């Protein structure tokens, strides 16, 4: 019953924004004693409302307290990201190396363009945790990091006139040259051929 009530509240819309629900067990939240007491206090309030006879305030009080609990969890995860700076920098370096290795290999031809999930798996992290960590450290999501890395490489290879645009597109993991051209134009503002011609001019 309460599950149905929550589903029909604003909380149901907000809850998908809490990306930590997709974190894996090794990315669990490590609470200080004060943080632990805050979480327990929130849970006790929710429990009290669940045990209280239902009235017109029940629904809003339960959902408001759940949202408060989730907001505290988000705050404490932000703190955890900030206090693990050395670990985070190591993950960033390994993420960059994973991307470099992937794009320098033949994997794009067989597996396609690199994905956040692929990189996260290689780093033994969940995709959401990796993306959140990168966003906290650099201001840019994992997907945007991948896109920028691919664009830098694409620009370099487009200037190599010994390769056709089709060859370059396959090397980067695009199944069709048209897909690569559309992506390149979206990122740069001109097609690969136009970019190559502008350089030669």
What is each residue range found by the language model?
Residues 97, 132, 144, 156, ...:
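DNA-binding alpha-helical recognition surfaces that contact promoter or target DNA
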Residues 181-201:
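…primarily DNA-binding HTH/wHTH and HhH modules…
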Residues 85-125, 144-163:
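A short, Lys/Arg-enriched amphipathic alpha-helix from helix-turn-helix/homeodomain DNA-binding modules
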Residues 3-52:
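A hydrophobic/aromatic-rich effector-binding and dimerization subdomain
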Residues 137-175, 197-201:
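Terminal helix-turn-helix DNA-binding modules in bacterial transcription factors
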Residues 118-125, 130, 134, 168-175, ...:
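Append "Primarily bacterial transcriptional regulators
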Residues 37, 41-86, 90-97:
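An amphipathic alpha-helical interaction segment
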């Amino acid at each position: 019953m309460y599950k149905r009530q929550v589903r029909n509240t604003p909380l149901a819309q907000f809850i998908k924004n809490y990306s930590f629900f997709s974190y894996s067990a090794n990315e669990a939240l490590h609470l200080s004693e004060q943080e632990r007491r805050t979480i327990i206090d929130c849970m006790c309030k929710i429990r009290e409302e669940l045990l209280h006879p239902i009235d017109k305030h029940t629904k809003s009080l339960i959902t408001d307290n759940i949202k408060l609990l989730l907001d505290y969890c988000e705050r404490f995860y932000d703190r955890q990201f900030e206090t693990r700076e050395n670990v985070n920098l190591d993950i960033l370096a390994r993420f960059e190396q994973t991307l470099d290795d992937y794009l320098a290999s033949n994997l794009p031809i067989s597996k396609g363009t690199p994905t956040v999930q692929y990189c996260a798996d290689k780093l033994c992290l969940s995709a959401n945790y990796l993306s959140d960590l990168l966003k906290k450290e650099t201001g840019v999501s994992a997907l945007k990091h991948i896109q920028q890395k691919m664009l830098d490489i694409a620009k370099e290879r487009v200037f190599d006139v010994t390769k056709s645009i089709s060859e370059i597109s396959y090397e980067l993991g695009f199944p069709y040259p048209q897909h690569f051209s559309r992506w390149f134009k979206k990122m740069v503002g001109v097609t690969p051929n136009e970019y190559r011609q502008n350089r030669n001019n």
